[in-house]
């Protein structure tokens, strides 16, 4: 009797062990299936993420799209693409070419020192002023403020030549011109804030809409191309009769340089 009980107990133990092993094997299979499925989901997510990043990388940027958008030329411009901006009296015999980038600190220093004298000379008919806008600092310092400010200048030029000159002076003013590495001009609301210091632009709904809608973004890109084709490599640059004028830092030095160029 004792021997039979012992054999029965052993059989029961073996059956219990077998059942336990089957349960464990089943758990292991389920675990492996979960791991494989999870790895598959992760792989799909990674592949999908990579595909999305590749697609995004190949998508044109906002300004690349703007370069192919409809061209709207501001008033007070000439030329097929509206990038010839000449201000002043028609009977002025010579034209001063001024190359500037809105983010350029040296341009700001020049405008703060000499800008008012330039405006007086143009108003007096001493010479005409041709403006050529650049955007290369956006590439060098990263950002889009040069392009955005140039577009806003187009909106100001559409109002009037005087509004354009006053707005340009405000953009370069000591109070409102940011550091070269600070891309404040990339923000429409900042450009409108600057415009609020210009009587002809303050509260001007057409100007505001032109800035916010990017009406002159394509024009800004065309103007930038015009600068790139000019051969000028830095700003500010002044030219008269195709000859470069050393950039003066005071009104008196500017007048001396201009008078010499006018006689040349």
Model region roles, listed by residue range:
Residues 102, 108-184, 188:
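Structural alpha/beta surface segment adjacent to cysteine/selenocysteine redox centers
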Residues 2-36, 49-60, 194-264:
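C-terminal cap of thioredoxin/glutaredoxin-like
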Residues 40-48:
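Core hydrophobic alpha-helical transmembrane segments of single-pass membrane proteins
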Residues 90, 123-124, 159, 230-233:
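Extracellular/periplasmic catalytic domains that process cell-envelope and extracellular macromolecules
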Residues 77, 172-185, 211-218, 253-258:
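Short secondary-structure transition/capping segments
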Residues 93-95, 125-128, 162-165, 202-203, ...:
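Loop/turn elements at helix/coil->beta-strand transitions in domains of secreted/extracellular proteins
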Residues 57-123, 133:
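Extracytoplasmic low-complexity, Pro/Thr/Ser/Ala/Gly-rich segments
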């Amino acid at each position: 009797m004792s021997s039979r009980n012992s054999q029965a107990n052993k059989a029961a133990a073996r059956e219990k062990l077998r059942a336990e092993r089957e349960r464990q094997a089943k758990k292991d299979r389920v675990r492996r299936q979960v791991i494989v499925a999870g790895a598959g989901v992760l792989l799909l997510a990674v592949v999908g993420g990579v595909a999305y990043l590749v697609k995004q990388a190949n998508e044109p940027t906002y300004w690349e799209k703007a370069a192919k958008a409809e061209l709207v030329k501001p008033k007070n411009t000439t030329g097929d693409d509206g990038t010839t901006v000449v201000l002043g009296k028609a009977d002025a015999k010579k034209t001063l070419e001024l190359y500037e980038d809105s983010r350029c600190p040296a341009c700001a220093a020049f405008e703060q020192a000499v800008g008012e004298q330039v405006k007086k000379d143009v108003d007096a008919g001493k010479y005409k002023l041709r403006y050529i806008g650049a955007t290369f600092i956006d590439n060098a310092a990263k950002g889009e403020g040069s392009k955005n400010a140039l577009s806003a200048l187009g909106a100001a030029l559409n109002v009037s030549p005087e509004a354009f000159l006053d707005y340009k002076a405000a953009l370069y003013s000591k109070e409102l011109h940011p550091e070269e590495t600070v891309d404040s001009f990339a923000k429409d609301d900042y450009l409108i804030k600057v415009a609020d210091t210009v009587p002809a632009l303050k509260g001007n709904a057409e100007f505001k809409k032109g800035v916010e809608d990017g009406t002159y973004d394509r024009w800004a890109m065309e103007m930038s191309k015009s600068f790139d084709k000019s051969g000028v490599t830095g700003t500010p640059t002044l030219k008269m009769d195709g000859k470069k004028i050393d950039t003066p830092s005071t009104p008196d030095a500017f007048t001396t340089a201009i008078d010499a160029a006018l006689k040349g």
